[in-house]
Curated annotation (Swiss-Prot):
Pfam families cross-referenced by the UniProt entry: UvrA_DNA-bind, UvrA_inter
Biological classification of the source: Bacteria, Bacillati, Actinomycetota, Actinomycetes, Mycobacteriales
The keyword GTP-binding belongs to this UniProt entry's keyword annotation: no
Cellular localization per UniProt: Cytoplasm
Quaternary structure note: Forms a heterotetramer with UvrB during the search for lesions. Interacts with RecA.
GO cellular component, one term: excinuclease repair complex
GO biological process, alphabetically ordered: DNA damage response; negative regulation of strand invasion; nucleotide-excision repair; SOS response
Organism: Mycobacterium tuberculosis (strain ATCC 25618 / H37Rv)
Keywords assigned by UniProt, alphabetized: ATP-binding, Cytoplasm, DNA damage, DNA excision, DNA repair, DNA-binding, Excision nuclease, Metal-binding, Nucleotide-binding, Repeat, SOS response, Zinc, Zinc-finger
Protein origin, superkingdom: Bacteria
Protein name according to UniProt: UvrABC system protein A
Length: 972
């Protein structure tokens, strides 16, 4: 096999016929400015060709079921292995997927519990066991010789009826006695039972005494009883006193409770422990573990309001508001309160009645349109029951969304959120966790953090038989948990829903899964695996990447993290600029040579020739103007109070899983969206948020796509295309033809090409070959019909304008202030290289986030806006971060507030204020470790962020020195 990976003539997207010679079995980092061509080379060229060649080796029948990829625009690639892509976009949104299921650890846990678990009765907690007839006989013969007993077959257990037919049938089969409700009767004269009472009936199969000579007879009697009673036999030891605990002993061929409690499971199989299978799933919630319930906190979001002012939110708007206010006034007459009393001051009895309903009818009075007083009596349902009823009755998606705004996902009341049947939750394994010895169910093990789960399974106490059965399974589980620990995910639990994972967490889970697969000779292409990872955990991620390399694989990592770049075997810097100014190889070689490369912007920042400066003076914080979250207790937050100063740039930091997103996104952003933007979101649990009166708008910028279809693009999303279409409609030619702005839209009939409905391409299905997209023969890819394209603005058609880069378009429309302002903002956030009409699905998460940011930036600022950004540096080069910080600081300089969740030290060190959560992730986090200026936080020994920040802000260290210090720390 060739020891080099050679690429010749790569021209995908903006690549300029790139030639590249890379070592195999190495850790290779692709870096460069955003839009320089890194992903085009790594994913769209090398990975695409590797996957295409592998799929082409399969049969035509197999290929038709696989989503194939088009052949990339490249002359040839040599030394290519089967390729695996690990990106951030394929996060599983299925509510049934968990960390345990996607890593397959849960599959092995199911096998472990099915084969080595100890079942118990969920009612009484007694151990449940199954025995063969021979085991039962041996156990009886081990008792003292001469012990007398009856062999009973329980044929009826706590059932109503007279059972006369059963007595006749048993008598006909040759049995002579039967025990009914503890009393033995002859079958020749059975008792007359009351039909409406529950009874226990056991057939007396035999009377025996313990002695060796009775072994054959005992075996026959036990087998007869087991057959008669569906696998259960009861022995009554007649020499013991009535009511004595050992007078009766129950044996079963199946899983059975010794105290006779019914079990809904016969045999334990791996599927019995699956919440996605009817054999194991809780019947109440079908294995989801949650259900929606009305939350009184959401029904009454502001307890300082009166009922007349709309304290009860579902009854405060619309044409029914007056009706419900009258109803509550009627209730007030009966209970002694009035609707002008704040909710907080209402008697507990009144609040309970409004929420849950009244037992008596209420007397409702009102004035009709003629001014006459009228009255009637009506039932008062209560707002909670009202919402549940409306939710179950409506078929309107809009109304469902409205009612769900007053509900939370709460744990299922039957399984308490564990998703499994009670019988399955009663199967345990004994082990040790955090120094405490005890038995845990599979659900309890999955609730542990991955670190604690690994400790528990390492300390399992198994007998020789169970150890022999479980040895190989435990080896697989421990191995997979070890890989998850290696990539810095020890704070997650196996029960964590996949839909709640960040892109970085999901990517690292897939990375751990790939290491667990043990494949060699594979080409792995990764997209920024360090996203969402604190500097503290970088070392373990780098060790994981090198371990994957050492197995005999080639890794190509698209990355901006300086620690990862420094530890790479080979670095490819693509640039020198972005878009049309990029697409060339600036550097291909080891790290030391990159630092000396004068043409490399990356090398300039890493060597310290360029740097992002720490501000000489930070903005002062006014303690009187703060946004304060009181009693934040969602997920792992421990009832903390956190104040966000207004009018400054605040970074929320902390290790992965410390509670940053929960605090900022789930609580603060949701409350602000509801109060300032009129949204109907469900905030995380908290007591209250103060300081809202200082603000008038929330702008939340995340990395979700700006659109799901190719018809959405930066021009349409920002709204600049509306102005461009208006310009075209104002041309002389358009006026002569009577064209309106709608004529220049590719989404509606009139101006678009109808052959391709405005897509510009035609999809040709090729069955087992990849679908082929060819330019539309009618419009030649221009999207518009011939008549529309005959209209020109300054010599350009509307199609040619959409094909311009944003930088070109900004220059083209410079005289038109209304258009230029939009485009200039896109250039300012580093998107000058993106085409104005570039389809939304082709934009990365970081690019989509910056399009949203630009869309908000061009709006008129009030100086009272709060901007919330979630890791805005994702996908950004050092130089792009500098541009982003200029934009953010411009917002703050106008009096606005910017809150960012961030791990990037360049952003953190330039912040005015830092709120550091932790100290650890998961259960070990959820508290405020430090807050203050970067210098204040750097001085806090308990803060991991402060430790790394001290190397950047402490003692006026230069950028180059601080980076050198950090690399030594990571290497340690």
């Amino acid at each position: 096999m060739a020891d080099r990976l050679i690429v010749k003539g790569a021209r995908e997207h903006n690549l300029r016929s790139v030639d590249l010679d890379l070592p195999r079995d190495a850790l290779i980092v692709f870096t460069g400015l955003s839009g320089s061509g890194k992903s085009s080379l790594a994913f769209d060229t090398i990975f695409a060709e590797g996957q295409r060649r592998y799929v082409e080796s399969l049969s035509a029948y197999a290929r038709q079921f696989l989503g194939q990829m088009d052949k990339p625009d490249v002359d040839f690639i040599e030394g290519l292995s089967p390729a695996v892509s690990i990106d951030q976009k394929s996060t599983n949104r299925n509510p049934r997927s968990t960390v345990g299921t996607i890593t397959e650890v849960y599959d092995y846990l199911r096998l472990l519990y099915a084969r080595a678990g100890t079942p118990h009765c969920p009612t009484c907690g007694e151990r449940v066991a199954r025995q063969t007839p021979q085991q039962i006989v041996d156990q009886v013969l081990a008792m003292p010789e001469g012990t007398r007993f009856l062999v009973l077959a329980p044929v009826v257990r706590t059932r109503k009826g007279e059972f006369a037919d059963l007595f006749d049938k048993l008598n006909a089969q040759g049995y002579s006695r039967v025990r009914v409700d503890g009393v033995v009767h002859p079958l020749t004269d059975p008792p007359k039972l009351k039909k409406q009472e529950k009874h226990d009936i056991e057939v007396v199969v035999d009377r025996l005494t313990v002695k060796a000579a009775a072994k054959r007879r005992l075996t026959d009697s036990v087998e007869t009883a087991l057959n008669l009673a569906d696998g259960i036999v009861v022995l009554e030891f007649v020499d013991h006193e009535l009511g004595a605990p050992h007078r009766e002993q129950r044996f079963s061929e199946k899983l059975a409770c010794p105290n006779g409690h019914a079990l809904a499971v016969d045999d334990l199989e791996p599927r019995s422990f699956s919440f996605n299978s009817p054999y194991g799933a809780c019947p109440e919630c079908s294995g989801l573990g949650i259900r929606k319930e009305v939350d009184p906190e959401l029904v009454v979001p502001d307890p300082d309001r009166t009922l007349a002012q709309g304290a009860v939110a579902p009854w405060s708007n619309g044409h029914t508001a007056e009706y419900f206010t009258r109803m509550m006034a009627g209730l007030g007459e009966a209970l002694g309160f009035d609707v002008d009393t704040p909710w907080r001051k209402l008697p507990a009895k009144a609040r309970k009645a409004i929420l849950e309903g009244a037992d008596e009818q209420v007397h409702v009075r009102y004035r009709n349109r003629y001014g006459r007083t009228r009255s009637y009596y009506a039932d008062f349902e209560g707002v909670l029951a009202f919402l549940q009823r409306k939710m179950s009755q409506t078929e309107s998606e809009q109304m469902k969304e409205r009612y769900e705004g007053f509900m939370r996902d709460v744990p299922c009341p039957v399984c308490a959120g564990t998703r499994l049947k009670p019988e399955i939750l009663a199967v345990t394994l004994a082990g040790e966790s955090k120094g405490e010895h005890g038995a845990k169910s599979i659900a309890e093990v999955c609730e542990l953090s991955i670190a604690d789960c690994a400790d528990f399974l390492n300390a399992l106490t198994l007998g020789p038989r169970e150890q022999a059965i479980a040895g190989q399974v435990l080896k697989e589980i421990r191995s997979r948990l070890g890989f998850l620990l290696d990539v810095g995910l020890e704070y997650l639990s196996l029960s964590r829903a996949a839909a709640t994972l960040s892109g970085g967490e999901a990517q690292r889970i897939r990375l751990a899964t790939q290491i667990g697969s043990g494949l060699v000779g594979v080409l792995y292409v990764l997209d920024e695996p360090s996203i969402g990872l604190h500097q503290r955990d970088n070392r373990r991620l780098i060790e994981t990447l090198t371990r994957l390399r050492d197995l005999g694989n080639t890794l190509i990592v698209v990355e901006h993290d300086e620690d990862t770049i420094e530890h790479a075997d080979w670095i490819v810097d693509i640039g020198p600029g972005a878009g049309e100014h990029g697409g060339r190889i600036v550097h291909s070689g080891p790290y030391d040579e990159l630092l000396r490369n004068k043409d490399s912007i990356t090398g300039a920042y890493l060597s310290g020739r360029e740097s992002i400066e720490i501000p000489a003076i930070r903005r002062s914080v006014d303690p009187r103007r703060q946004l304060t979250v009181v009693g934040a207790r969602e997920h792992n937050l421990r009832g903390i109070d956190v104040s966000f100063p207004l009018g400054v740039l605040t970074s929320v930091t902390g290790v992965s899983g410390s509670g940053k997103s929960t605090l900022v996104n789930d609580i603060l952003a949701a409350v602000l969206a509801n109060r300032l933007n009129g949204a109907r979101q469900v905030p995380g649990r908290h007591t209250r948020v103060t300081g809202l009166d200082y603000l008038d708008k929330l702008v939340r910028v995340d990395q979700s796509p700006i659109g799901r279809t190719p018809r959405s693009n930066p021009a349409t999303y920002t709204g600049v295309f509306d102005k461009i279409r208006t310009l075209f409609a104002a041309t002389t030619e358009a006026k002569v033809r009577g064209y309106q702005p709608g004529r220049f839209s590719f989404n509606v009939k009139g101006g678009r090409c109808e052959a391709c409905t405005g897509d510009g391409t035609i999809k040709i299905e090729m069955n087992f070959l990849p679908d082929v997209y060819v330019p539309c023969e009618v419009c030649q890819g221009a999207r518009y019909n011939r008549e529309t394209l005959e209209v020109h603005y300054k010599g350009k058609t509307v199609s040619e304008v959409l094909d311009m880069s944003i930088e070109e378009a900004a220059e083209f429309f410079e005289p038109i202030a209304g258009v230029h302002r939009y485009l200039r903002t896109l250039v300012d956030v580093g998107l000058g290289y993106v085409r104005l009409g570039q389809p939304a699905p082709t934009l990365s998460g970081g690019e989509a986030q910056r399009v949203k940011l630009a869309s908000e930036l061009q709006k008129r600022s009030t100086g009272r806006t709060v901007y919330i950004l979630d890791e805005p540096t994702t996908g950004l080069h050092f130089d792009d971060i500098r541009k982003l910080l200029n934009v953010i600081n411009g917002l703050v300089d106008k009096g606005n507030t910017v809150i960012v969740i961030e791990h990037n030290l360049d952003v953190i060190k330039t912040s005015d204020w830092i709120i550091d959560l932790g100290p650890e992730g998961g259960a070990g986090g959820g508290t405020v470790v430090a807050q203050g200026t970067p210098e204040d936080v750097a001085a806090v020994p308990a803060s991991y962020t402060g430790k790394f920040l001290a190397e950047v802000v402490g003692g006026g260290a230069s950028a180059a020195t601080s980076r050198s210090n950090r690399r030594r720390n990571v290497s340690a």
